[in-house]
Amino acid sequence: MPNIVLSRIDERLIHGQVGVQWVGFAGANLVLVANDEVAEDPVQQNLMEMVLAEGIAVRFWTLQKVIDNIHRAADRQKILLVCKTPADFLTLVKGGVPVNRINVGNMHYANGKQQIAKTVSVDAGDIAAFNDLKTAGVECFVQGVPTEPAVDLFKLL
């Protein structure tokens, strides 16, 4: 079974909070970005790689590649798995990726979204995906940075 030390939803994927604070807090040595678009975009990949400290590996995989390959991960790989949306995590969970808890970080406000926390805004599709994750036994909590208290996402919906 892969050693996923943290699963996080963050629309920005890898940036300062993830690359420095969360990687260190979780003790991760590999950041796995599960996103179909970024997996095919070397420019975005290069920008994200610059944020990570030396010695932290990074992979940019499509959702299907994560589903097909995550179980091959070595025990020594301490994986921080990051997706942009709850729907992406739902796809991974339905595909057999062992995710039990999801840290909900940054989901930006846009038209049609409702702000439920300082850094989290959701629409009907997000809520449906979160509810399906809950049904699958996945705990979801809002926590922007490790020093903030974790708040049960389902108490905010």
Curated annotation (Swiss-Prot):
The keyword Transferase applies. GO terms for molecular function: kinase activity; protein-N(PI)-phosphohistidine-sugar phosphotransferase activity. Residues 1-157 form the PTS EIIB type-4 domain. This is N-acetylgalactosamine-specific phosphotransferase enzyme IIB component 2. Keywords: Cytoplasm, Kinase, Phosphotransferase system, Sugar transport, Transferase, Transport. It comes from the Bacteria. It is an enzyme of class 2 (transferase). It is found in: Cytoplasm. CDD domains: PTS_IIB_man.
